[in-house]
Amino acid sequence: MRLKANKTWSQQQLAIKLRLHQDPAPGLFSLERQHLFILAAKTALAATLCWWLARAFGFHEAYWGSISAIIVLQSNVGSTITASRDRILGTLIGAAFGFSFSLFGALPWNYIGALLAAVILCGLLGLRNSSRLAGVTITIIMLVQKAGSRWGLALDRVGEVMLGIVVALAVSTFVFPDRARVRLRDGLVQEFLILGALFEAILEGFPASPSGDLSSVRQDALAMLRENNQLLESARSEPSGGPGWNEGLNTLLQFGRSLFDALVALEFSLEGSHQDGYAQQLEPALGKLAADIRSGFHHLAGSIHEWRFDAEPPPMNLEEDIEQLEKQMEQVRHTGIGFSQAEILRAYAVQLHLKQIARLLRASRVETSRAVGEGQN
């Protein structure tokens, strides 16, 4: 299965990373900088619009709304929603504690008490990111000397923050929206293609010398796993994109981690195998399974890109490959007397890891198909 010609930004970045082609727009108008320019324009639009609306609504300090819009506007809709939630909760908690503690006691003791109470409450509620914002709100309400009541100052602060958040959410959602779940889907395409590249780099060292790119490809795969895990949190904050979107994305992330662990185990099992000869006795079954695993990574990446997982890849059958490899091992078992015990054990370990990777690949497609509800009425 081939990926569509109109690749997304992240897929084009992967092609550049794997040296499949050069950046089509180098310099000032590269793909990465285009994304940066759009985010900068959206931030400027949100801040300016919020300042204008705040003045129109009669807020005395319109700049606080602009500050809120700048803080919560993130690179994708899901992250913006998460940041908005944290800021709303932090502002409400800070306003409540700032006003309440200003009614009794004297500075600085009531201020210290308000900060302690707000931070502890946020910690107990699991609102770690909101605790800092609550502290900022308390500081403004209790320490900024202004005419008027503390209650009025608290209400103004909440109103300005709410306005900034509403404007930021509107701009993020309707002006060149960048959905976290779509970016995560593209990130998963990258992840499984990089895992396939890692698999190929590992097998280059069996029974030859290890690939020179192995370490860098492994680091790329690990970085992609971490980035996609962060995107999942943002994707969960977005409105659902359809039946099974979040379930499917979460399933693929879990299998991606399992496949990475299996590939690392395969790499360890191949240490010292550059002169092994026993594994040659397992050909062509071993080579056929390895080739189909390579194709399996690319097929799964294509399925993620199309978001369809119910089509069995016609030219390969991983379970049949495993069965043929087991038969081949049974046939050559008597030839092991001419090889070292370490060499034989290494060959057995390799075939076990290959079988595990093959079954994980198949299970990732089948389980994701079930998670997204394919074939259900």
Which functions belong to the PLM regions below?
Residues M1-I38, R183-L249, D261, A265-N377:
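Long, hydrophobic alpha-helical segments that serve as membrane-spanning/inserting helices
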Residues M1-L225:
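A transmembrane helix-and-boundary motif of multi-pass membrane transporters/channels
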